[in-house]
């Protein structure tokens, strides 16, 4: 077994891989952090809203919505992980210990893996629901729980492996350029796994599309509903294109550079674009909320109700504060009924 460099600094591994470790804040670092913080905050707020909507509306207490809730939780975790990265990047990277660096990387790997795996689970559940001709899946809750547990076990496995064994601390010639403490084989496996998930999603949604098209077409042959058939088909095409298109746009660039680095491409300038492609992958956690949740009419109504309730509570508190202030100077009393609209009481 070769010599292991457990006592070396982060700078040692970055120099070994040829990745620059900045000692001061460059304009590029400031831009990346500013964009990253903005995306992270939006991801946190959006997915918190999705989780609150699913928890508060009993109509969403169905297996498919449990999976959507798990997707929101994974994306919320991704927002936290990326926020942690933004506070430990740039010149601060050099001050990290090896354990701190692996924690930073592990949070990202775990959260993004959970998000991607949940996307596949949702696709499989949608296929099962469509084949069973159900609006809401009746998949036993125990199976949904097992599916969610399986997603997180796989995510934690991929996230924790680098810190324990799948690193290059004992084999410097295997270190990657984008993640100087990780083995190139880890990056290649992660990229290929994400690509496999995408191909499986394409296969599942393609099967759903052709199944629904055949079914609606048979119905159209017996009933004069050709315009409705066309509308249903176009709507399904739109849904499939949005789902797969969002995944391709957000994930493909990052998968390509990870795979190139994992395969040891020396002539590929992966370091020039890695931060921006990682930001694009993180933006998928924001896009997921729009694609999988906000397109649901009932979900949108629940969002409006939650936001209106929050605004109403704030308005009520402000009115109550105004009332208590006014009582000191006049005997006029203001009552606030449950509907939140102030009424004047004539007691003088």
From Swiss-Prot:
Keyword hit for Transmembrane helix: yes
Q: Which parts of the chain span the membrane according to its record?
A: 31-51, 67-87, 105-124, 144-164, 186-206, 240-260, 277-294
- Supply one GO CC term from the record: plasma membrane
GO MF annotation: an example = lysophosphatidic acid receptor activity
Query: InterPro entries, from UniProt?
Result: GPCR_Rhodpsn, GPCR_Rhodpsn_7TM, LPA_rcpt, LPA_rcpt_EDG4
Q: Where in the cell is it found?
A: Cell surface; Cell membrane
Q: Which UniProt keywords apply?
A: Cell membrane, G-protein coupled receptor, Glycoprotein, Lipoprotein, Membrane, Palmitate, Receptor, Transducer, Transmembrane, Transmembrane helix
Q: Does the keyword Transmembrane helix apply?
A: yes
Q: Where is the lipid attached (S-palmitoyl cysteine)?
A: 308
Question: Per the UniProt annotation, where are the glycans attached?
Answer: 7, 15
Q: Which SMART domains match?
A: 7TM_GPCR_Srsx
- Which segment of this protein is annotated as the motif PDZ-binding? 345-348
Which regions of this chain are Extracellular-facing, per the record's topological domains?
1-30, 88-104, 165-185, 261-276
Q: Which residues does the entry place in the Cytoplasmic compartment?
A: 52-66, 125-143, 207-239, 295-348
Return the similarity comment: Belongs to the G-protein coupled receptor 1 family.
- Which proteins does it associate with, and in what oligomeric form? Interacts with SLC9A3R2/NHERF2, MAGI3 and PLCB3. Interacts with RALA and GRK2.
| Job of this protein | Receptor for lysophosphatidic acid (LPA), a mediator of diverse cellular activities. Seems to be coupled to the G(i)/G(o), G(12)/G(13), and G(q) families of heteromeric G proteins. Plays a key role in phospholipase C-beta (PLC-beta) signaling pathway. Stimulates phospholipase C (PLC) activity in a manner that is independent of RALA activation.
Protein name per UniProt: Lysophosphatidic acid receptor 2
Organism of derivation: Macaca fascicularis (Crab-eating macaque)
- Gene name in the database record: LPAR2
């Amino acid at each position: 077994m070769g010599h292991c460099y457990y006592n070396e600094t982060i700078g040692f591994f970055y120099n070994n891989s040829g990745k620059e470790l900045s000692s001061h804040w460059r304009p590029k670092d400031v831009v990346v952090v500013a964009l990253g913080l903005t995306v992270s905050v939006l991801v946190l707020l959006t997915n918190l809203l999705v989780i609150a909507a699913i928890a508060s509306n009993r109509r969403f207490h169905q297996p498919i919505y449990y999976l959507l809730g798990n997707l929101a939780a994974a994306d919320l975790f991704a927002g936290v992980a990326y926020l942690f990265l933004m506070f430990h990047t740039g010149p601060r990277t050099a001050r990290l210990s090896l354990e701190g660096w692996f924690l930073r990387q592990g949070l990202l790997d775990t959260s993004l893996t959970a998000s991607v795996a949940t996307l596949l689970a949702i696709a499989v559940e949608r296929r099962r629901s469509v084949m069973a001709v159900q609006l809401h899946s009746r998949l036993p809750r125990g199976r949904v729980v097992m599916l969610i547990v399986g997603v997180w076990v796989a995510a934690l496995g991929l996230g924790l492996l680098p810190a324990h064994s799948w690193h290059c601390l004992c084999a410097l010639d295997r270190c990657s350029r984008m993640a100087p403490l990780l083995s190139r084989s880890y990056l290649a496996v992660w990229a290929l796994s994400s690509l496999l998930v995408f191909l499986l999603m394409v296969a599942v949604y393609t099967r759903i599309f052709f199944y629904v098209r055949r079914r609606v077409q048979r119905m159209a042959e017996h009933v004069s509903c050709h315009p409705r058939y066309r509308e249903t088909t176009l709507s399904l095409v739109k849904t499939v294109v949005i789902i797969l298109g969002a995944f391709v746009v957000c994930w493909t660039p990052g998968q390509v550079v990870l795979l190139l680095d994992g395969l040891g491409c020396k002539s590929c300038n992966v370091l020039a674009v890695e931060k921006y492609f990682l930001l694009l992958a993180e933006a998928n956690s924001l896009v997921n909320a729009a694609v999988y949740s906000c397109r649901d009419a009932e979900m949108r109504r629940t969002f409006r109700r939650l936001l209106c309730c929050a605004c109403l509570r704030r308005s009520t508190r402000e009115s109550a504060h105004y009332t208590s202030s006014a009582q000191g100077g006049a005997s006029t009393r203001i009552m606030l009924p449950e509907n939140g609209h102030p009424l004047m009481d004539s007691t003088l």
